[in-house]
Amino acid sequence: MNKTVYIFGLVLLLSLGLLGSNSYAAGTSGRSGFMMLNSSDLIGASVRDYAGEFAGIVNEVMIDSGGHAFAIVNHGDYGLYGEEGANTPVPFEALRISQTKSGEEKVVFKMDAERLDFGPYLDPTMPINRQREADIYLHYGIEPYWVGSRTAEKGELKEFNSLNLVSAAVENSCGKVIGIVNEVMVDPDGHAFAVINHGDYDIFGENGVNTPVPFQELRISKTKDGQDIVFLKTDTEHLDFAPYLGYPLKTNSRQYEASIYEFYGIQPYWTQGSGLSK
């Protein structure tokens, strides 16, 4: 099964959990149940419907240009779809994700499996565009996030393979390489960030520091040989002072996520029209 992580645009919170470690902070809940998730940990996780019946497995994670993620669930009647089944994008809002005692991701589809069976599936002949993404949201009774939003990106979607994105070089506006993409992380509502490994290695050690960056602050393109390259829209110094993983605030908290958005002058999505959600 192809365990690729796709990205309609760019990606989400990437992390290190602890500096100098390859294990990340995803999968541990805060007091309110808030949880940061490594997309790589979700791939291969079993998906069950609200009745506890097996519905499929997470095959990929996709992100759109606005940094919103979908779990691609492989499922279906294999006699009908063939041995590879069908791959259906499901908004994170339609999923409940937790961890088992053994540390494995547990994914529950909040609706019955029939809704999944009739959901819009990935079709190589039908590239994802804004209308098709809207159809995905509406199939699950979710209003597309850009409807009524003054800040959400409404342009054409772009698609990236996150396995190519991870380890991609990150350049500043002057074309200087300042770091690499280290991982891909998502919050419970499917909002994503790219975690950039960077910094003065004489200060931070050989592993540098890992900083989550909202997709709005990145531009992604491809080199002539097809490799992804990431451009930071702000200056390098701005990145150096941004909230990093291991920052004094607890990584798995709304307060920490808010500090990331606010550092870049972005209003946290859950505060629009209300106070900070805890």
Language-model features, listed with the residues they occupy:
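Peripheral interaction segments used for macromolecular assembly
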Residues: 4-6, 21-278
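Bacterial N-terminal signal peptides
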Residues: 9-18
